[in-house]
Amino acid sequence: MNAEKLVVDWLNADPGLRPATASLSMPPDASSTSPTAHITVERTGGTESPFVSRPLLAIQTWAASRWNASSLAVDVSRRVRHITDIDEVADVDILSITDFPSPDGRPRYQVTCQLTIKTNYTESEEA
């Protein structure tokens, strides 16, 4: 199971986060002169074992102002707290919500979280 895609799909299923949408990368038309509300998800680490995946994820919220980026980050963290509604997700820890301006000056916040996901291990995966 791809944890990044799982979180992107989970966030995009919530109409309360719109007009922001989540993806694995920034939209091609995004720029510092035309900031739009957007959410990016990337795996930054974590552990894997035969039966459990514990991905560490950085979820970044981009918006026209620092306040809007912060507000979106809070909304995202609330949504992610309920990802355990998906059967394979056993637990989620929200580790931080941080002001994280982009190098080009765009307002951005980062939600760092760690999921605990049940995996389906088979002997054929050992090879």
Report the location of each language-model feature.
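Short, charged interaction patches at domain edges and termini
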Residues: 1-10, 44-52, 92-127
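Short glycine-rich, basic-tinged beta-strand/loop micro-motifs
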Residues: 51-64
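Small/polar-rich, solvent-exposed N-terminal microdomains that initiate assembly or binding
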Residues: 1-47, 67, 87
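Short, conserved charged micro-motifs
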Residues: 67-71, 122
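Broad gene-expression machinery/nucleic-acid interaction feature
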Residues: 36-38, 56-58, 108-112
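Hydrophobic alpha-helical membrane-association signature
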Residues: 3, 72-76
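A common structural junction motif
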Residues: 77-86
